[in-house]
């Protein structure tokens, strides 16, 4: 089976002052603090979370 694509996501803005659902999306992606980078699988669920908090993130494929 082919390896799934991954997306590299970096939190570039702080979560302070954001609404709770946006903080939950960041936690769901595995982001803990500013400048923290994680690799997540390219799934519709992860894409939805990335789109919701795109103003806080830098995304590389």
UniProtKB/Swiss-Prot annotation:
The keyword Ligase does not apply. GO terms for cellular component: cytosolic large ribosomal subunit. Disulfide bonds: none annotated. InterPro entries: Ribo_uL30_ferredoxin-like_sf (IPR036919), Ribosomal_uL30_bac-type (IPR005996), Ribosomal_uL30_ferredoxin-like (IPR016082). It holds the Pfam family Ribosomal_L30. GO terms for biological process: translation. Belongs to the universal ribosomal protein uL30 family. PANTHER family: LARGE RIBOSOMAL SUBUNIT PROTEIN UL30M, MITOCHONDRIAL RIBOSOMAL PROTEIN L30. This is Large ribosomal subunit protein uL30.
């Amino acid at each position: 089976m082919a390896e799934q694509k991954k997306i590299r996501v970096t939190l570039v803005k702080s979560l302070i002052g954001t609404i709770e659902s946006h903080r939950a999306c960041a936690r769901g992606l595995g982001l803990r603090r500013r400048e923290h980078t994680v690799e997540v699988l390219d799934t519709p669920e992860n894409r939805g979370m990335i789109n919701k908090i795109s103003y806080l993130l830098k995304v590389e494929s």
